[in-house]
Amino acid sequence: MKQSNVEGEIVDIIQSARNEFDGIIINAGGYSHTSVAIRDALDIFKGKIIELHISNIYKREEFRHKSIISGVVTGIICGLGINGYILAINSMHEMLNENK
């Protein structure tokens, strides 16, 4: 598990994950709506990706309704609070083990 609030560090974490992990669970917060760099790094990652939002982005301000990273992720979980992390971990486990 890695965490950063710095866009460049998040990109570095995603890029290093290409050689270490089969999946990424990402809560990019406000960067979901603004960061082309994070989107591009996720797009290069070949594993499974779950985008996570603690709040329901569709119940918030209009500009939050569009996540630019959604187009390159495997699935999205939003609006379930911190329980979304448990669902994301369980879902990732299922996805990574479905062909074994």
Question: What is each of the regions a protein language model found here?
Answer:
Residues 2, 50-52, 77:
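Hydrophobic/aromatic beta-strand patches that form the interior of the parallel beta-sheet core
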Residues 3-46:
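N-terminal small/polar loop signature for handling phosphorylated ligands or for N-terminal nucleophile
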Residues 7, 31-32, 55-57, 82:
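Alpha-helix N-cap/helix-start and coil->helix boundary motif
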Residues 23-24, 48-50, 67, 74-75:
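Structural motif
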Residues 36-37, 60-63:
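Short, conserved acidic/polar surface loops in the N-terminal third of protein domains
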Residues 44-60:
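Short, acidic/small-residue loops that bind anionic groups at enzyme active sites
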Residues 64-82:
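Short beta-strand elements at the ligand-binding edges of bilobed clamshell
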Residues 78-100:
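A charged, well-structured terminal subsegment
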